């Protein structure tokens, strides 16, 4: 009999992609079904079943079939075999709606184009914590968390929340969730969640009741009046403006993060340094009620 380790190494990349997806779904969604695999890779149901069987053969005990959810759930001794389940690897994959992380190319530039990103400090939760959060989102269930807010010096407070969406602001990740204590929807920074437990209790709220998430408003921006005409014209070209105005449609819940990310002068008299704040907000009165914390 061929050792399982040898069989794992011999798996072709196309098949390995599907096995990685099975592993990521099982861990972070809490369940993976034949239909999930078929939909993600455009497979027939028999082909998806074959992949699930192969995974079970190569990683025995990792998946257990659960009749109540019509799919496979992580076994008690679940341990990743094909996928890197670290939050730093998985969250970008989830955000980009990709099926797999960490291709086989390593440092090889498969497009022949060098790229780089800013070396920002990691602001991520542990793998176990993130899995509880994502399972609650996927299963639309309540989530009990320990959360340390910036305003509290006390030990992390216990909260009951109902999460619906993961958000990447470019500087950090947070989860948008209904907070039972305050009876409203709020943002919870993932790195400040010290503990999390996905409960079997169904969530009572829904994203459709999160008005600030559902409703969008338009940010009306312009090159800063303190810049000379040449630089103002360059900025309009830079942002693809068709006239003298740059308009960005944003969910109300994300307005403050966009203002921060674009370094926009939100002062009433546009008094910020134009070299540091190259854009200014024109519809301050309309926007401030939804993102007052981001205003100067």
For the regions a language model picked out, list residue spans one by one.
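Short, basic/aromatic recognition patches that contact phosphate-bearing ligands
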Residues: 1-84, 221, 272-296
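Short, compositionally biased low-complexity segments
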Residues: 27, 98-112, 226-236
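Conserved short hydrophobic interaction patches
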Residues: 55-58, 196, 261-265
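A generic structural signal for beta-strand entry/edge sites
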Residues: 69-71, 172, 245
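Bulky hydrophobic/aromatic content
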Residues: 74-148, 261, 268-281
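Core beta-strand-centered patch of the WYL/Sm-like small regulatory domain
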Residues: 112-230
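Polybasic (Lys/Arg-rich)
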Residues: 214-296
């Amino acid at each position: 009999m061929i050792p399982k380790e040898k069989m794992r190494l011999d798996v072709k990349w196309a098949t390995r992609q599907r096995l990685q997806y099975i592993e990521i779904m099982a861990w972070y969604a809490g369940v993976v079904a034949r239909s999930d695999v078929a939909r993600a890779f455009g497979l027939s149901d028999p082909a998806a079943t074959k992949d699930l069987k192969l995974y079970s053969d190569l990683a025995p005990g990792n998946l257990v079939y659960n009749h109540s959810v019509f799919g496979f759930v992580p076994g008690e001794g679940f341990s990743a075999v094909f996928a890197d389940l670290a939050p730093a690897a998985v969250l970008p994959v989830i955000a980009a709606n990709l099926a797999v992380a960490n291709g086989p190319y390593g440092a090889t530039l498969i497009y022949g184009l060098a790229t780089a990103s800013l070396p920002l400090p990691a602001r991520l939760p542990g793998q176990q914590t993130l899995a509880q959060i994502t399972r609650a989102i996927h299963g639309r269930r309540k989530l009990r968390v320990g959360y340390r807010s910036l305003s509290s010096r006390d030990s992390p407070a216990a909260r009951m929340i109902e999460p619906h969406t993961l958000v990447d602001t470019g500087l950090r990740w947070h989860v948008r969730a209904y907070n039972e204590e305050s009876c409203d929807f709020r943002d919870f920074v993932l790195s400040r969640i010290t503990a999390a437990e996905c409960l079997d209790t169904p969530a009572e709220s829904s994203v459709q009741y999160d008005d600030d998430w559902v409703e969008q408003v338009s940010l009306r921006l312009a090159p800063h009046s303190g810049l000379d005409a040449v630089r103002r014209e360059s900025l309009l070209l830079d942002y693809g403006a068709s006239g003298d105005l740059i308009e960005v449609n944003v969910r109300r819940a994300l307005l403050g993060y966009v203002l921060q990310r674009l370094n926009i002068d939100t002062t009433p008299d546009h008094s910020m340094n134009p070299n540091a704040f190259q854009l200014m907000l024109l519809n301050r009165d309309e926007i401030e009620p939804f993102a007052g914390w981001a205003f100067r």
